[in-house]
């Protein structure tokens, strides 16, 4: 099952059965494959587990399952040597392959001492690569945010730069040894760290002339909506930029349950291929590798240093809300509901807005003259990027109290939303931007995956002052609102509930 280059984005999962239990591992691997998994990873704690990979391989292949097996090795390079003889790929963790276990002590090295530590890695790693060459075994260099060595931590700190260097030390040896059957991964449960680090890794690889394929995943993502949203946000943000060759959606559920979620995410992102060109200009002060929040002028509780807001609608007359996730603003269209929610602000179409308490007018890009005559201290201007004409820009310059609600019907809506936010900055405008995302989903999972994937890059780029999810399917408003708040929390820009880190094994 080839990986990288022009090949499809591959989907994988990991067994949670004891690797010495051949029958259980074979049965679970079959379920993963039957669900659509293309690689199966197995925990390989010791030599006995590594040797049993042969029996698992035989059990699968004798029944027609030719799925490649990936041995997951930590702490013991001898285990990796054995696993390389029986698995199609071996994953090693640079944080504990040669460097001793973490003591969380600050270590001081001279340059000569540091170079000697790197030589220790080379002396142990090269024989392993030779075994892999002999057996045609691929290698995954997999860095985890929580397992950087004391040596790396002492020099680089607990930073994306440290994670990248931990990986690059091993990649440079692979290049020196002309070993190219390598895939790399840098994972974290923190989606911001994960996205920033992968972006940085790709940049450093390009500087050094490397182009190894990437495995993407958010570690310990959890189950239910949290796991799906976090994975869609982190993985989706990178896939949207063309980064990633294989993915795993880590859920604390049965391994085969991860596969349909991953498939939906990949299919949604790849459906944008060959989309129409989006003209645009990147803001001059934007740093893709280390983005900061776009500078905006606060309008009431939107923009500036305020937390991103959640907009919602109740156009169907159903006013139910989630008890824990009440939107900040509700778009009511042509008339206020008979019964309003306490603590909620309402948005009405500008031509029917009469200045009622706790209400604000909404304009479209064809209502600029009406906007000029409106005295509201907060206005919402709904506009797609392609309607951001000179007249609209001039109007926004005269009305810093206007919040832009970015709309898009483009196949690559992430790109068009980005283009709008960047164009505002290029024009010198500091109006806050809320991203309007529309769907027609009938299941919560589909909405979570698509909305998470669409919002990821916008959040991590620092462009998001608010989110407005509009769904024309069968989902309740409570589910839609919870998804919006879940996306902001997964992007670590607004916390609305207790978060549990759940390790699936």
Regions found by a protein language model. Name each.
Residues 108-125, 130, 153-303, 387-505:
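Catalytic alpha/beta core domains of metabolic enzymes, predominantly
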Residues 20-31, 75-81, 167, 231-235, ...:
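Short, acidic/polar
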Residues 1-2, 8, 16-18, 97, ...:
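Short, glycine-/Ser/Thr-/acidic-enriched flexible segments
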């Amino acid at each position: 099952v080839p990986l990288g280059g022009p090949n499809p984005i591959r989907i994988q999962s990991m067994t949670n059965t004891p690797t010495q239990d051949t029958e259980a591992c074979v049965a679970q691997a079959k379920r993963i494959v039957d669900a659509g998994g293309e690689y199966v990873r197995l925990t390989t704690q010791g030599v006995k587990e590594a040797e049993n990979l042969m029996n698992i391989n035989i059990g699968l292949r004798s029944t027609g399952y030719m799925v490649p097996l990936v041995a997951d090795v930590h702490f013991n390079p001898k285990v990796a040597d054995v696993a390389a003889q029986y698995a199609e790929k071996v994953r090693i963790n640079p944080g504990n392959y040669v460097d001793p276990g973490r003591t969380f002590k600050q270590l001081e090295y001279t340059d000569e001492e540091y170079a000697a530590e790197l030589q220790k890695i080379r002396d142990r790693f090269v024989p392993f690569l030779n075994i892999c060459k002999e057996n045609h075994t691929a290698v995954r260099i997999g860095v985890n945010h929580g397992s950087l060595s004391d040596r790396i931590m002492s020099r680089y700190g607990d930073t994306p730069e440290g994670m990248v260097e931990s990986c690059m030390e091993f990649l440079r040896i692979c290049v020196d040894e002309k070993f190219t059957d390598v895939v790399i991964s840098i994972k974290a449960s923190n989606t911001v760290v994960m996205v920033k680090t992968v972006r940085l890794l790709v940049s450093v690889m390009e500087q050094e002339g490397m182009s190894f394929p990437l495995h993407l995943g958010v570690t310990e993502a959890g189950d239910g909506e949290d796991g799906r949203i976090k994975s869609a946000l982190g993985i989706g943000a990178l896939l949207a930029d063309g980064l990633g060759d294989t993915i795993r959606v880590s859920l604390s559920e049965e391994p085969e349950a991860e596969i349909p979620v991953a498939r939906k995410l990949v299919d949604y992102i790849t459906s944008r291929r060959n989309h129409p060109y989006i003209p645009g200009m990147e803001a001059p002060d934007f740093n893709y590798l280390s983005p900061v929040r776009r500078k905006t002028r606060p309008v009431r509780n939107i923009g500036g240093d305020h937390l991103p807001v959640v907009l919602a609608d109740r156009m169907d007359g159903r006013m139910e809300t989630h008890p824990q996730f009440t939107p900040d603003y509700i778009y009511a269209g042509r008339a206020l509901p008979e019964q309003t929610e306490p603590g909620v602000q309402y948005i009405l179409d500008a031509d029917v807005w009469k200045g009622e308490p706790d209400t604000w007018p909404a304009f479209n890009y064809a209502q600029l003259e009406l906007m000029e005559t409106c005295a509201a201290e907060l206005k919402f201007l709904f506009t797609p990027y392609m309607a951001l004409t000179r007249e609209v820009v001039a109007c926004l310059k005269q009305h810093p109290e206007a919040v832009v609600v970015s709309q898009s019907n483009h196949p690559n809506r992430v790109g068009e939303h980005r283009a709008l936010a960047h164009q505002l900055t290029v024009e010198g405008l500091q109006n806050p931007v809320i991203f309007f995302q529309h769907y027609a989903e009938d299941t919560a999972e589909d909405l979570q995956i698509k909305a998470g994937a669409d919002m990821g890059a916008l959040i991590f780029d620092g462009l998001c002052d608010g989110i407005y999810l509009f769904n024309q399917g069968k989902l309740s408003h409570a589910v839609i609102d919870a998804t919006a708040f879940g996306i902001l929390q997964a992007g670590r820009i607004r916390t609305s509930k207790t978060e549990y880190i759940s390790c699936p094994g």
